[in-house]
Amino acid sequence: MAVPNNAAPTVPVIPSDGPHSKFVRYAHAVAKEHPPLFPITPATRPLVVGLDLRTLGPQPANYEDLVHVLRRDVVTPMLMVFADDDTGLAEAWMQVCEVEERFVIDYTDRARATRFMDAMQFGVSKMRGEERRCWRNCRTFDVYSEIDAHDAPTTDLAVDDRVRAAVLAAAGFGLGTDVIVSLGPTVGRADVGDNDIVTTVTPDDLHPVFGHYLRMTGNRTVAEYRSVGPGMSVVQKMEPPSVTEMYDIGLASLLGWLDMFRLVACQLRDVQAVAEIDTVRTRIRRAARALDEVVAALSRTNGRDAAPSLDTIEFASEAFDREMLYLIAIFDGYGRAFLRWLDPASGGDLRKSLHSAKTLDDYVDPNYPGAPQLTRLRELQRFAFACSQLRNRIHDAVLPTGSFTNRTYGSAQAIAIDLGQTEVELTQQLVDRLGVWRATPPNSIFGQPTTVAEVATTAVELFTASLEYIDLFTHLIMCTKPVNAPNAAELLGKVTDNGFRPPEPHPTEALYRQLFRWSH
């Protein structure tokens, strides 16, 4: 017998002694003396850092922060020199890094290099003093360096510099280095194909790589300070209670205005505003975690390989989707909170988002006319809008992500998003910053080129632009009274910015900024 629609609803009986049904078919934690089945911190190995001593020079004392990282027990330094370098180049580095070996690359110039078919080959010797402990043969296609030079948008790099970078990358790849620290002119350049094989960074840029390593391995020790006294050695550690709090501290170092805004809300005892700001901060942390997982997945790819594995593409794609969903949740939540703060008693429609230009047109521009932040906010809103268009595709269908060739030679492929199957509206600034190019799908012989965006670059640039957008918007509304909102919450415009800025950040803040610096 059917229940009539106008029947009184039955009040559910909710047990107070715990749930009466549970899913229990999963392994539980064992005693603490036994390892967990699925540990938060997976089995890991040290970060292997190659050092290009020809460009760094003989004095490690010039690189105090770099040495601090190299002396960590989770880092394995490899000292790399060329056969014609000064014999004493590595001596001081061996002492500070507490290693006994150096790796000698038997390469001087192209004319004297041996050949193996189309490849240039050279040896790398592991030396302890004058004793050779082992030797390996490495190869690189120097013609690729010539093609890179021909295709490059600028002519500021000599072919010999490109070939030397190729030799260094081939040696590093053979030795198992994760990253090479160098001051060579090819460091970090997209038009140098060998940066797809082994990442090269400046001494300062090793810190973000190391910070990502710490977060992905669950290592909470952000710094170690050693002191040696008579008969003893002391190591002091800077270690937050959890990886989650490490993210919170690191992101707060990048979002100073948002951090201050929360303090203002706490002082005003605006509980709802504090909760809204905390929600924004939590979503930023989760977006950052998703970004880190995108980069971690891409660490399984290499420019020597023909194509990334299907599992790697899936892992990176899922993490990128998650990042976009959290970024849009940030813009939506902050936009709605801002409208409520403009008129707390209105009770009107609050479904507005900071990703929308219309929100800036209708609510920001009229309340902050002539504000110096508006021009930059408009530029950053384009990045937020790109996030929303990618999010829309995620909701409608699967975001098309796959592998595409990203050089005019060879068969190596990069993971990229096929923007041709989305509605992302590209500006020249987005093209330049998101790593966009025209590519033909590798499995489509007669296919038409499509517009794609390199997933690592897109993930990093959208995230960093979003952080700047949120922090700049926070500065605007915290330090400026809205002119057309007579009933605005006290929170808006509560702080007077007199222009003072500390000349230098606190050392701890500076350290976290280095470890959480995803882009330059």
Where would I find each of the regions flagged by the language model?
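Small/aliphatic-rich secondary-structure junction motif
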Residues: 75-78
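A long, hydrophobic alpha-helical segment
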Residues: 269-323
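Acidic, Ser/Thr/Gly/Pro-rich intrinsically disordered interaction regions
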Residues: 2-50, 54-68, 72-73, 85-278, ...
